[in-house]
């Protein structure tokens, strides 16, 4: 047993007592605050992807760099790479086409339409957990094969763009005509922390398809991109996989035709790898030893590569021309009878029992094998609805080619937002409904026009609360994950947003603003809605004794109803918006966690979120006009009263019922109820990180700073979808 005497004795001999043990003394080691308090509010999610982690610096302009790219020279190099087989990872049939298609597919396929997160837009396949998912075995090799090309072209092409372009070139080099390619995906430099991949603690934990409809998850098992290719929970039953397939592809916004096209198209080229038992496969890249240099899954089976490669454990080749585009997938699917069998690794798959050996071996030209299929491939034949589509594609290969080209383009561009963000020479001209298209601008308001419109709005009779509320309702639908939503398009005036419960009060201002727009004919309704917020904030600041100019950039347009996919826009309806003290459901997370979620979608920092909530409360912008969180006697005045009164120890807070969603703030001396609040209000006094920010804004010298910070954050939200201003 060590005593204080031991410490003194060690010091006397010239040895530091704290350097004697075997403890990990590196930064970040030891028990963390999250270990002690696992339910701690994730304020850190608002600090992701800062310039401190970006080696290119905040002045780097990817669009500018891309304009210097020899685009077709890059495609030529990618085409050459496809057939330059490397001994450390030999190419099947001398082509990496199937590998690169899978890399692009698995990068894009993490997208979930329910919350807009995931997808290929930031090159996340380079980082954990995706770089080490069980479904991404061997894609580390695909990325490493691309390194010489990335090294050559440097920052003129992002990893995120290169992954998808490599998949496109692989298809084109195999004889397929793609729909096009839009660049513009900017790399980030650390893993996304905000994506909820699920609660499971073990890889490949099975999820019931019904559970996928209740959570923002895109796969039926933890660590898969879509579904288990052996059927749900390794059932081996093609029909049982239909519900899972629909759920997962539906979560990406794909219908049955797109689903069939994507599965069949993705399985027209290449193969799966299951030469031997998966027990021979080593740790994934994140767990691999340092000398592996970021590669993982080293195999001890035979040579570990080429004919001995193990990836999924399945050993399937679908078509007799696995490096050339064809309709053989459907021809084989319906021509032969299929019997269940197992791969050399023991995985469940199907073989065409009555077929001749027509499938070429990937490394020995003298060998042939029978066609094989995944359990989930046969779902396309035996599910009645999928079968109808599959037979149509069987009989009309051109229809299949067109459907796959469009579905592949949608898959690989779904998280990029509107077409205005696409760059490069191969951007398709056609507007697609899932891109949330917008018309061309028809207004170009002058400075005088804007001044006149501001006067008209100010004289309209709308209160500060109404002006601020309508602008927030329009702009706050933006999602940073897939760049959907926002004020541009004025879709607040269209279905479904006009009928959302959260917008019930806000849309009451629309008829007034629509009248101003029609009478002036000088600006779009979208611009006038945002300008209403400008007027409201400036009036509120003036009432607080400050003359503030709120920046305004015209140029928004008004979308039409036929340019608005109602079903897809329903996904933007918030289940909670803590900025407006709105919550529709109590069975999803905590109110304060949902506030963080909303702020993260709006790309806000913790100080920006704090300033906005405090300002929205004193401006009376609650969705239902309630007084929850309105800690002021001067509603409509842009003051720091919210913070001053929240942190005032004269008041003590008690929940109004067992749900602990609403609270009363009582005077400690008189017992009088002074204020009411939600969890989205009290979190700024409860959470230590947010309280630290709130204390800044509550200080006696902070009023002007608070107003300026509120205005800056407000303008940021109003312009989140103004990609034309970048």
Curated annotation (Swiss-Prot):
Q: EC class of this enzyme? A: oxidoreductase
GO molecular function annotations of the record: catalase activity; heme binding; metal ion binding
Co-factor requirement: heme b
Record field: catalytic activity: H2O2 + AH2 = A + 2 H2O; 2 H2O2 = O2 + 2 H2O
Q: Spell out the InterPro entries in the cross-references.
A: Catalase_peroxidase, Haem_peroxidase, Haem_peroxidase_sf, Peroxidases_AS, Peroxidases_heam-ligand_BS
Q: Specify the cross-link site (Tryptophyl-tyrosyl-methioninium (Tyr-Met) (with W-105)).
A: 226-252
GO biological process terms held by the UniProt record: cellular response to hydrogen peroxide; hydrogen peroxide catabolic process
Q: How does it assemble?
A: Homodimer or homotetramer.
User: What name is this protein filed under?
Assistant: Catalase-peroxidase
Which species is the source of this protein? Answer: Escherichia coli O139:H28 (strain E24377A / ETEC)
Q: In the record, what lineage is assigned to the organism producing the protein?
A: Bacteria, Pseudomonadati, Pseudomonadota, Gammaproteobacteria, Enterobacterales
Gene coding for it: katG
């Amino acid at each position: 047993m060590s005593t204080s005497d031991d410490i003194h004795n060690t010091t006397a001999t010239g040895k530091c007592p704290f350097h004697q043990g075997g403890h990990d003394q590196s930064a970040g080691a030891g028990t963390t605050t999250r270990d002690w308090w696992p339910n701690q509010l994730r304020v850190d999610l608002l600090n992701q992807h800062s310039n401190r982690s970006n080696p290119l610096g905040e002045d780097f302009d990817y669009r500018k760099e891309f304009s210097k790219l020899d685009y077709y020279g890059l495609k030529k190099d990618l085409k050459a790479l496809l057939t330059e087989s490397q001994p450390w990872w030999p190419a099947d049939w001398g082509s990496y086409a199937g590998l690169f298609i899978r890399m692009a597919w698995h990068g894009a396929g993490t997208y979930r339409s329910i919350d807009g997160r995931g997808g290929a837009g930031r090159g996340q396949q380079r980082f954990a957990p995706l770089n080490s998912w069980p479904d991404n075995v061997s894609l580390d090799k695909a990325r490493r094969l691309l390194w010489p090309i990335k090294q050559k072209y440097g920052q003129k092409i992002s990893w995120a763009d290169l992954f998808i372009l490599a998949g496109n070139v692989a298809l084109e080099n195999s004889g397929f005509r793609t729909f096009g390619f839009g660049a513009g995906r900017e790399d980030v430099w650390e893993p996304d922390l905000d994506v909820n991949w699920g609660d499971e603690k073990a890889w490949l934990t099975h999820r019931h398809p019904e559970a996928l409809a209740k959570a923002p998850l895109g796969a039926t098992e933890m660590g898969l991109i879509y579904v288990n290719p052996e059927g749900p929970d390794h059932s081996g039953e093609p029909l049982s996989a239909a519900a899972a397939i629909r759920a997962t592809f539906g979560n990406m916004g794909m219908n049955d035709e797109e689903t069939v096209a994507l599965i069949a198209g993705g399985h027209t080229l290449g193969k799966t790898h299951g030469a031997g038992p998966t027990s021979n496969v080593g740790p994934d890249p994140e767990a691999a030893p340092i000398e592996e240099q970021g590669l993982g899954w080293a195999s001890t089976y035979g040579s570990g590569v080429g004919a001995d490669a193990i990836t999924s454990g399945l050993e399937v080749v679908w078509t007799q021309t696995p490096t050339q585009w064809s309709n053989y997938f459907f021809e084989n699917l319906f021509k032969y009878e299929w019997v269940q069998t197992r791969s050399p690794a023991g995985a469940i798959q199907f073989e065409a029992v009555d077929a001749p050996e027509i499938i070429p071996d990937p490394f020995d030209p003298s060998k042939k094998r029978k066609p094989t299929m995944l359990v989930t491939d046969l779902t396309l034949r035996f599910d009645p609805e999928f079968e109808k589509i599959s037979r149509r594609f069987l009989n009309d290969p051109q229809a299949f080619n067109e459907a796959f080209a469009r579905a592949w383009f949608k898959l690989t561009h779904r998280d990029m937002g509107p077409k205005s963000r696409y760059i490069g020479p191969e951007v398709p001209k056609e507007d697609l409904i899932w891109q949330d298209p917008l018309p061309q601008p028809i207004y170009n308001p002058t400075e005088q026009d804007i001044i006149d419109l501001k006067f008209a709005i100010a004289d309209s009779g709308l209160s500060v609360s109404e002006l601020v509320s309508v602008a927030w309702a329009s702009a706050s639908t933006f999602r940073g994950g897939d760049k959907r939503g926002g004020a541009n398009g004025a879709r607040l005036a269209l279905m479904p947003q006009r009928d959302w419960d959260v917008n019930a009060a806000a849309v009451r201002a629309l008829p007034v603003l629509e009248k101003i727009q029609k009478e002036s004919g000088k600006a779009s309704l979208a611009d006038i809605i945002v300008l209403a917020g400008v007027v409201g904030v400036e009036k509120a600041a003036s009432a607080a004794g400050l003359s503030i100019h709120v920046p305004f950039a015209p140029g928004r347009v008004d979308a039409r109803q036929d340019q608005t996919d109602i079903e897809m826009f329903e996904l933007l309806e918030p289940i909670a918006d803590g900025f407006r003290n709105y919550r529709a459901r109590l069975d999803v997370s905590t109110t304060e966690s949902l506030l963080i979620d909303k702020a993260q979608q709006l790309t806000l920092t913790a100080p920006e979120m704090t300033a906005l909530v405090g300002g929205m409360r004193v401006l009376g912008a609650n969705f239902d006009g309630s007084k929850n969180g309105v800690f002021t006697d001067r509603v409509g005045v842009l003051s720091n009263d919210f913070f001053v009164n929240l942190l005032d120890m004269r008041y003590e807070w008690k929940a109004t019922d067992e749900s602990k969603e609403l609270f009363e703030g009582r005077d400690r001396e008189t017992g009088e109820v002074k204020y009411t609040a939600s969890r989205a209000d009290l979190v700024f006094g409860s959470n230590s990180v947010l309280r630290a920010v709130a204390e800044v804004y509550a200080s006696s010298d902070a009023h002007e700073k608070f107003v300026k910070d509120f205005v800056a954050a407000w303008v940021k939200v109003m312009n989140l979808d103004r990609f034309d201003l970048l």
